[in-house]
From Swiss-Prot:
One of its GO terms (biological process) is arginyl-tRNA aminoacylation. HAMAP family: Arg_tRNA_synth. Signal peptide: none annotated. CDD domains: Anticodon_Ia_Arg, ArgRS_core. InterPro entries: aa-tRNA-synth_I_CS (IPR001412), Arg-tRNA-ligase (IPR001278), Arg-tRNA-synth_N (IPR005148), Arg-tRNA-synth_N_sf (IPR036695), ArgRS_core (IPR035684), DALR_anticod-bd (IPR008909), Rossmann-like_a/b/a_fold (IPR014729), tRNAsynth_Ia_anticodon-bd (IPR009080). NCBIfam families: PRK01611.3-4 (NF002447). This is Arginine--tRNA ligase.
Length: 609
């Protein structure tokens, strides 16, 4: 239990003794206020039981038993302010490993889900990075996480790319990345003024896709796309194919479940006559038209109905698909796929989630809300609450809108190549010796890919991003290189200490010698579990990215601090014996905090910068 949690428990215990139970909030005190932590608990107690808040605060201050690490408590009006014991607090931070409050249950995260007709472009990377980071955060929180990638193998985009290959007599040379080659045909077809006359040929390909005749070609595209995602650090557990979802009868099973709801009907007159409709007014208030058509009067299912069936399956409301191994990821883990010739999921290995997160762009806000509402219509209120749409806004590149159909895009592979190239150029400009190292390419890879991931994560998902190279790779500002540089700086201090023979594990540390400036840094380190728990709770990795920036800024402020005489205030290796060892142990913990934080968002720390 961290110190804030201990303080909360101590205040609540004291309030209980006073006969005024309270759910105490523990907050950091503002910079211009006394103390390190505070609570307005006396306000709540006075409101519930009557009495003067200031008097209750004074009594509470006398009653509360302070946990180790808290030096004293003061009642300031109706507030309680707690003052930390710097040495005890820092030691507690150093000796306590990063650990999140454990959450149980399985979470299914669907992300990527790019049409299998061309390569990923830079705009797709936001989806991949958001989904992969959420998987990392939720695993750290203790959840079992299953990452799914939905493959629309029967859609028009896949058909157009395959048709273009046939129509233009295009031949793959085996050298160019397959998905990039396939995408060139897609762009060519959509620029062809004769395209309307080619509709019958495109439809013929679509029918073959629906029959599964061209699946090996689509699989080849998917494997090429996955190589792009692997390179960015993303990993997957299961690929679900549209043709298998349709062929497994999910639609019929879902409609059977919804048939029994008082919110569904089959009108016999009016504009919905003969259709199967769902009234979502209780679940989506404010709609002009609360009725959603699931199946048209002619028997054709709307796409929303298919999505509902798929979501019901993810939550384990029914079975149906078969599975088999598809390929291995770079670590040798098996990626599974749905397949007509696979085996039934008798062990309930896939789906059966307690929570489902769909990472899909903001254009799908309304359809995803309909899918969520369908769970409520089916009487599955708990599942409705845990059906999450992680919505995100579009990405532009250097101010330019991306369009894969028109070929106005930079491929994700090219973007990663460019990031590494530019990172190496930055290294050469800063430190030519560093750029000449044998591992310079690996250093540049970590900086470049880190810059891309961070740029896609640092803002709230609903905010638009304009990705700009110069900003993303800057060593100053809200960038991955800024955080990575701070982490490397911490490692360099430890390396010099070890070369000098100084202990870095706390042996010989004089914790009481630590001044408040070290306490400020330790308080920032101690926030990590709370930040990660918040990211898991609100389903957004951006708070972890922002914390990484705060951690780097706090360390840089500590590192560059000066005494009143203008001399370095925190030169670790020149600190007095005892203080030096305490500070080195703190830097070890800081470095681990950088590693843990960046790992949550899939960013690696380079060996040098």
């Amino acid at each position: 239990m961290d110190l804030k949690a201990q303080l909360k428990a101590a205040v609540e215990q004291a309030a209980h003794q006073m006969g005024m139970p309270v759910d105490a909030a523990i907050q950091e005190t503002p910079a211009n206020k006394p103390g390190d932590y505070g609570t307005p608990a006396a306000f709540q107690m006075a409101k519930a039981a009557g009495g003067n808040p200031a008097q209750i605060a004074a009594q509470l201050a006398q009653t509360v038993v302070l946990p180790a690490g808290i030096r004293r408590v003061e009642a300031t009006g109706p507030f309680l302010n707690f003052f930390l014991d710097a040495g005890a607090f820092v030691r507690g931070v150093v000796e306590r490993p990063f650990e999140l409050p454990k959450r149980e249950g399985k979470v299914v995260i669907e992300h990527t889900s790019v049409n299998p007709n061309k390569e990923l472009h830079v705009g797709h990377l936001r989806n991949v990075v958001l989904g992969d980071s959420m998987a990392r955060i939720l695993r750290a929180a203790g959840h079992t996480v299953e990452v799914q990638n939905y493959i629309d193998d029967t859609g028009r985009q896949a058909a157009e790319s395959l048709f273009a290959t046939q129509h233009y007599g295009r031949v793959w040379d085996g050298v160019q990345k397959y998905d990039q080659w396939l995408g060139e045909g897609y762009v060519q077809l959509n620029a062809d003024p004769q395209k309307p006359e080619l509709e019958s040929g495109i439809m013929e390909i679509m029918h073959k896709l629906e029959a599964g005749e061209l699946r090996p070609l689509v699989e080849q595209t998917v494997k090429a796309q996955l190589q792009t995602c692997f390179r960015l650090g993303a990993r997957y557990d299961l690929l679900n194919w549209e043709s298998d979802v349709v062929g497994s009868g999910f639609l019929a099973q879902a409609m059977n479940i919804l048939e029994g709801s008082r919110y569904t009907s089959r009108p016999t007159e009016g504009k919905y006559a003969g259709a199967f409709i769902m009234d979502v007014s209780e679940f989506m208030p404010g709609l002009e038209e609360p009725n959603v058509v699931l199946v048209r009067s002619g028997g054709t299912a709307m796409y929303a109905a298919k999505d509902i069936g798929y979501q019901f399956w993810k939550f384990g409301l029914f079975e149906g698909m078969k599975f088999k191994p598809f390929m291995q990821d770079p670590e040798g883990n098996t990626i599974w796929t749905s397949a007509p010739d696979g085996q039934p999921d008798d062990e309930r290995r896939f789906g059966h989630a307690q929570e489902v997160i769909n990472v899909i762009d903001s254009r799908q806000d309304h359809p995803q809300t309909v899918v969520r509402s369908a769970l409520g219509v089916a009487g599955e209120q708990e599942k409705e609450e845990r059906s999450i749409h992680l919505s995100y806004a579009f990405v532009t590149l250097e101010g330019q809108t991306i369009s894969g159909r028109k070929g106005i895009a930079v491929s994700a592979d090219d973007a990663m190549d460019e990031a590494q190239k530019r990172a190496l150029s930055v290294l050469q400009g800063i430190n030519p010796d560093l750029a000449a190292r044998e591992d310079a390419a690996e250093i540049a890879r970590r900086i470049g890919l880190g810059a891309i991931r961070f740029a896609m994560l640092k803002a709230e998902p609903t905010r638009k991003i304009d990705f700009r190279w110069e900003q993303a790779l800057a060593l100053n500002g809200d960038t991955a290189p800024y955080v990575q540089y701070a982490a490397v700086r911490a490692a360099n201090i430890l390396k010099k200490a070890e070369e000098a023979g100084y202990a870095t594990d706390g042996t010989g540390a004089d914790w009481d010698a630590l001044p408040d400036i070290d306490l400020v840094l330790a308080k920032q380190i101690a926030k990590l579990p709370e930040v990660a728990a918040q990211a898991a709770r609100i389903h957004s990795p951006h708070v972890v990215a922002q914390y990484a920036l705060d951690l780097a800024t706090s360390f840089n402020a500590w590192y560059n601090a000066k005494t009143k005489q203008g001399k370095p205030a925190t030169n670790v290796l020149q600190s007095e014996e005892g203080l030096r060892e305490a500070r080195l142990a703190l830097i070890v913990r800081l470095r681990k905090a950088f590693e843990d934080t960046l790992d949550l968002i899939g960013i690696e720390i380079p060996a040098a910068m």
